Amino acid sequence: MDAEGEQKSNGVKEPNTPLREALDEIFLNVGYLLRSLLANVPNALYHSQLQAACQKFQDYCDLEEIRIIEAKRVVERDLRSLEAKEVEEKSQFASFVSATPPGANSLQGNVSLPSGNNFFTSSFDSENISKPGEVSLSESQLLGNLNQQSSIQLPDRMPKTTNGTLADPNMPPKTTVNDQDVTKDASQQFGGSNFSNYLRDNDSFQFGMNTDASGDAHLQASEFLLPNLFGNSSTSPQDNFGTSNSALSRNLDLFGSPSSENKSTAGSASLFPNQQMGIDLQAQENYSAAFGNDGSFASHLTNTFDNALNLPTDIPTTESINDLFGENFDFTMTK
């Protein structure tokens, strides 16, 4: 008994049991698992970051596609409204030309309208319509004045008159001219041009415009078209739902937005004030939501994608497993 105890105390190795072999196998597998896990963790993080960046890029592409579709709808709607406005203006102009009395637009008209009922001065009265073939009083007066004007023969040099009568009896031939007739003849001589001016100043009555805009009754279609799509842009990407200026000056930035200084003022000058304000507000709401206030589409896409990624250029490295367990760590737990 004592000999066996001494043999054990002298360091004689005992034979391996099945339990000890199983434990050694378990610790060896755990070591391999730890090595594999620590080596693959940085790669997994890099892969997850790349997947997240790709997902952001896909979402951004979907958003830009939605904006392009909305912008297309806005452009199509504006073109339809432009066509409808042109058709309406043409119909109003045709009705105005057909309703204009003969000789009203003549530059040398000698006929002035009577002070009776007409479509500019008073409401239409059906009772004053003359029968076919019947000459009205105003027409008879007009014909009489014309005959009287044709019968007057004035000398080469107009002599002095006293109350409309020639003072010198030796002057040939004596002709009595009434001051009232002369005044009336002058009004007939210049009545046509005055009436034309009256018609031009009263375009607002026919077209529903203010007096200042009456000269621009026939608006050009180019004044309603959208701004230039291919202008140079120096603006940086900003929010998609607001503009500092009106949307017509900084609107279509898909290929570059023109500056507000380069915008022509002819369209805004010829538009009616209420209509111009409505177009500005409506365009600001639609164009700002559709395109935002960005610069060029390519630069905005590149900047957004680069800012969203922010990935390292090299795959990150990990610490060695020896720094965690030591250089001489024995996973087999053998002595």
Swiss-Prot record:
Residues with Phosphoserine modification: S257, S260
Keyword list, A-Z: Phosphoprotein
Start-end of Polar residues biased regions: 257-271
Region named Disordered: 152-179, 252-271
Listed GO CC annotations: cytosol; nucleus
Protein name per its UniProtKB record: Uncharacterized protein C4F11.03c
